[in-house]
Amino acid sequence: MEIRETSAIDMHLCNRGNSIASGICQSNDGLLESTCNTDTCQVEGVSSPKEGCTRRQYQLEKSSSEAPSDNVSSAENSISLMIAHADSSVELQYIEALKQENGLKLPNTEVVVTARSLEHITSYHEFFDIDLYMNNLSTNQFGRLLIWSPRLPSTHTLLSQNFHAFPLGTACVADTQFQGKGRVNNLWESPVGCMMFSFTLAMENGRVLPLLQYVVSLAVIEAIERVCETKCAPIPNVRIKWPNDIYANGLKVGGVLCTSTYSSKKFSVTIGIGLNLDNEKPTTCLNALLQDLTSYSHLIRREELLAAFFGRFEVLLDIFLRQGFSTLESKYYDKWLHSGQRVLLEERDQQNLGPSNVFVTVKGLTSSGYLLATDDENNKYELHPDGNSFDFFKGLVRKKFAE
């Protein structure tokens, strides 16, 4: 038996990302369309010139070969509500193309874009405040088209498997994930309260691609600091644990994942980020740290932090692509945990008779993006993230030996 379930993409087009829709009319293409009849779009009581503010409604129709069961796993068989917001007609063309090209791809799922009515949309602002996000966004490219869903298998999977269906810089955010991605095929725990999102970009120079994750990590730290400064809140001690983790008070609160494919002389890169914002489990979260630092509530909203991240990342990426990572190195070292850190490196001796212990001091990063360390005799060691097991808090690095 085949069942059909529906979820939605709502395309909201406005130069400020917000509108007061005063009427709904039927458009010529059968889609429901709402427009602003006033001369301004209202954003938190501030008027701004209206430039073609239009809302269009789309549905994603999901086909499944089996009806979901009544147990918990049934939630993994559905796509839930998906809403996309943008602020230019360019992104609308991509959504229109999805209709013609038979929708999006997801593992074990057929997704087809069809037209439905606005009544399928309920109070999605209770989950993610699109207007708050758009009002804080200041980028030219990244995050201008945002896809949101209360529940997805993985934001990373959605974008990576549909990379060319959306413009570069498209972002996808979910309230929860049940197949979140981590490094080396690890699963990332994705409870409610964790800020989970992915976005896309393209690069031509593969030699600097390993350094991109450091630019992303730096942007995460700077975004947290910017939001706290804006709120006049104390800044928590959040730092980068090499190569791609975000730590606070010795506990992991976030991580970065970058994957890429190569085609037509370009790398198609999908970047995923998970950050504990409101969930104190399994470790701690940013808002809990803020509450410990002050008696006044300065809670960070994920919409604000997401917009701040894209703002910082766009600036840092431009510097990285034009001037190289060396221009950002001092900033990066200021935010990581490892400058001058002394660790015990366990490796095999030259006769391969067994492990040999060498004390090394972390010096920084190599031009290839690997960890650079030296021993007491000034011998240099280049440590690869996928070839070593790092326990920096115990001061130990173990070589991953082939069995």
Task: Go through the PLM ranges and name each one.
Residues F163-A165, L187-E304:
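Nucleotide and nucleotide-moiety/phosphate-recognizing core
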Residues L365-Y370:
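Short, conserved beta-turn/loop elements at beta-strand boundaries and strand-helix junctions
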Residues M1-T230, L396-E403:
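N-terminal lobe of the biotin/lipoate ligase/transferase fold
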Residues N378-D391:
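A short macromolecule-binding patch
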Residues L293-V358, K363, F392-E403:
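Conserved, helical-rich catalytic subdomain that frames metal- and/or nucleotide-binding sites
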Residues L251, L353-P355, D376-N378:
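Glycine-centered tight beta-turn/hairpin loop motif at sheet-sheet or coil-to-beta transitions
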Residues L371-D375:
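SH3/SH3-like beta-barrel fold
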Residues D175, P243, G250-G255, G340-R342, ...:
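Conserved beta-strand residues within beta-sheet cores
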